[in-house]
Amino acid sequence: MKIFFRYQTFRFIWLTKPPGRRLHKDHQLWTPLTLADFEAINRCNRPLPKNFNFAADVLDQWSQKEKTGERPANPALWWVNGKGDEVKWSFRELGSLSRKAANVLTKPCGLQRGDRLAVILPRIPEWWLVNVACIRTGIIFMPGTIQLTAKDILYRLRASKAKCIVASEEVAPAVESIVLECPDLKTKLLVSPQSWNGWLSFQELFQFASEEHSCVETGSQEPMTIYFTSGTTGFPKMAQHSQSSLGIGFTLCGRYWLDLKSSDIIWNMSDTGWVKAAIGSVFSSWLCGACVFVHRMAQFDTDTFLDTLTTYPITTLCSPPTVYRMLVQKDLKRYKFKSLRHCLTGGEPLNPEVLEQWRVQTGLELYEGYGQTEVGMICANQKGQEIKPGSMGKGMLPYDVQIIDENGNVLPPGKEGEIALRLKPTRPFCFFSKYVDNPQKTAATIRGDFYVTGDRGVMDSDGYFWFVGRADDVIISSGYRIGPFEVESALIEHPAVVESAVVSSPDQIRGEVVKAFVVLAAPFKSYNPEKLTLELQDHVKKSTAPYKYPRKVEFVQELPKTITGKIKRNVLRDQEWRGR
């Protein structure tokens, strides 16, 4: 009788668990976590669960709600390309397709839990499939923009010891040119209708892959994603995030900054290589059960952008300030955005005048937010709060955001200092885990009881934060983080360049752009400066990701330096911004 009872109990648990989810080893009844549970965790009212997997605990739960009619008839992913091609997946379809993708990664590609996978794909549906497949299998997902050059890819593959790369045909030639220098890379997976010698075909393998796959029981703090983030010196650092830091940590962002519900359709303009894609196009959106809309445009243009907003029932728009600066130059009153109700921006400071022009022309407010690759959303203008033009808004839970001095002391309102997040007595779960293989850089982010962002700001008496500038020399242009070292390294490869210093320079559309101060070698000093500028710009575009090239170049006799010979970038930067 006892055996029969135990069998019936086990059968009940098996039938009620989420699809593709293994039972806990102790066969305890599985209780699904809800959006309210995730919010309670972010508000520190509930402990972090021991185990968590975004695919099983979030995506598969929305799939269940679709079956029971608890979620509106709204796609999970809606992709278009402006050429008549369209993809619409429900959460159920996303689940079955991502299980097929998981089998592709683990069987023909031979990847196992904890292996690192580099993914360099444009805004195509396969990017989302591979992302979710990695979550299901415990494979560490490492996204990169398709603008990466062969040199950039080589660094990332060698630094991460990636065992496999998933790439599109735009990137495959660059990978091929450096693959022999990557001894850890075992498999190349091509997402393309074309076949390449030495590459496995994702489409062919996916077509015959099984939909049966059991999701790995991942720990909440288990590594899930690595982002390469630029700094002022050296090459990009590998910021590692866990299943919960991204998968649970963006709950409040989704509910109160993005203001999403399961009936919403969000269009987030971020490139797939950046953490902003994780915020707006994966975790925040799908935590709330919303639809992620994607328009793959060959090249951004305002007319196509505005036509998309008028044609599709997009309710929520998230774009960098650069896009809004371009849009407000159009006569927006001619357009009818019938469904659009909530607009957001972030990645760089937004000019107050642009915010006002957008509001006057569309009747919609712009809600600015501020965050970082390492820690996600830090502060934001949230729905229901007063918007102070030019402010980044108030601090977001679970963070205690403060302004501190060089000794780690909290400064009073109105005093400029570094924007910092309190780490003690308890480190917030949504922090990045570490910079992989770089304990010195990881330790350098801590000052006393705080994590320092590297940004300077001011908090007013109402708790609103105002961005002043970078504490270091990182340039943020059109939302891209650009380290001066990478641009200077590219420039020095050209025979005309003796040395250079790269800083930010004000720009009406992009906020700030890369400017290079260049000391020329003697044989090149008589060259036509305009032609030489174009030559150097073209050289940088070929040597590193094209978005990093210096849009401004000034030839100088010498660079300002300290007594020890270090270039004083701050002098050049101040010179650029002084008259603004």
Curated annotation (Swiss-Prot):
SUPFAM superfamilies named among the record's database cross-references: Acetyl-CoA synthetase-like (SSF56801)
Keyword terms: ATP-binding, Fatty acid metabolism, Ligase, Lipid metabolism, Magnesium, Metal-binding, Mitochondrion, Nucleotide-binding, Transit peptide
Presequence extent in this chain: 1-22
This protein's name: Acyl-coenzyme A synthetase ACSM4, mitochondrial
The protein's required cofactors: Mg(2+); Mn(2+)
Biological role: Catalyzes the activation of fatty acids by CoA to produce an acyl-CoA, the first step in fatty acid metabolism. Capable of activating medium-chain fatty acids with a preference for C6-12 fatty acids.
Family per similarity comment: Belongs to the ATP-dependent AMP-binding enzyme family.
Keyword check for Ribonucleoprotein: no
One GO BP annotation of this record: fatty acid biosynthetic process
Domain of life of the organism encoding this protein: Eukaryota
Record-listed ATP binding positions: 229-237, 368-373, 455, 470, 566
Catalysed reactions listed for this entry: a medium-chain fatty acid + ATP + CoA = a medium-chain fatty acyl-CoA + AMP + diphosphate; hexanoate + ATP + CoA = hexanoyl-CoA + AMP + diphosphate; octanoate + ATP + CoA = octanoyl-CoA + AMP + diphosphate; decanoate + ATP + CoA = decanoyl-CoA + AMP + diphosphate
InterPro entries, per database record: AMP-bd_C, AMP-bd_C_sf, AMP-binding_CS, AMP-dep_synth/lig_dom, ANL_N_sf, Mitochondrial_ACSM
Protein's UniProt keywords contain Hydrolase: no
Organism field: Homo sapiens (Human)
Gene Ontology CC: one annotated term: mitochondrion
PROSITE patterns, sorted: AMP_BINDING
